[in-house]
Regions:
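Acidic, surface-exposed loops and disordered segments
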Residues: 1-217
């Protein structure tokens, strides 16, 4: 893929609001997108996420009153994803220890040099000293995951749209009631739908480069 094709792909990627309900993403293509999400980068490589693929039609109907910004995705898109974010991802948490031992295959305890680097990064550099700040920082990682999946989808000719229009507390309570979320461990970060648009692509409206880009010599 050359530079011109890369830019053309950005223009082709479109936050579609209308989807063809009769067109479905193939199993192989969807497996590829999930793999892209799995391989996405995250701060310190902690992967503080989980994806829920919502296929249950009854649950889609139930979510509509509490997810106004997701109606088009719940009604017509081929695949609808709820991105969960892990809570309490501190340097000394059981989860971080588990990641280091089982995924990174490295020795790790809260007194090790690497643990202290993470501690300093979280507490002093990023000021992650509250439950909310930790949640927001971890949520940023899920947006990277979602963005990577959306761009990979565009490469496969699949449309997508990120979704933030929902009542977080109500959605979390509903998912917990259904047994798909433990709010002591996870929260809802963002949603996205994937499928094939049933509308024309409108030209992108963006600031000119000189407004949003500056070089420091």
């Amino acid at each position: 893929m050359d530079r011109e094709q890369v830019i053309a792909l950005q223009h082709q990627r479109f936050a579609a609001k209308k989807y063809d309900p009769n067109r479905r993403i193939s199993e192989k293509d969807w497996e590829a997108l999930v793999e892209v999400g799995r391989l996405a980068p995250s701060s310190i490589g902690l992967e503080p996420w989980k994806m829920l693929l919502l296929k249950n039609e009854r649950m889609k109907e139930d979510l509509k009153p509490m997810a106004w910004g997701a109606l088009f995705g719940l009604e017509g898109a081929s695949h609808f994803v709820i991105y969960l974010v892990r809570k309490g991802v501190t340097y000394d948490s059981d989860y971080v220890k588990k990641v280091m031992h089982e995924v990174k295959k490295r020795d790790y305890d809260t007194h090790s040099r690497f643990a202290q680097i993470i501690k300093n990064f979280q507490e002093n550099d990023m000021k992650l000293n509250s439950e909310r700040s930790l949640f927001d920082w971890a949520s940023k990682q899920t947006y990277i995951q979602m963005a990577n999946m959306m761009m990979a989808a565009a490469m496969l000719g699949i449309d997508s749209c990120p979704i933030e229009g929902y009542d977080q507390e109500k959605v979390e309570a509903y998912l917990e009631e259904k047994g798909y979320l433990n709010t002591a461990e996870f929260g809802v970060s963002v949603m996205a739908c994937f499928g094939y648009r049933n509308q024309e692509i409108t030209p992108k409206t963006r600031w000119k480069t000189e407004v949003i880009y500056e070089v420091i010599e």
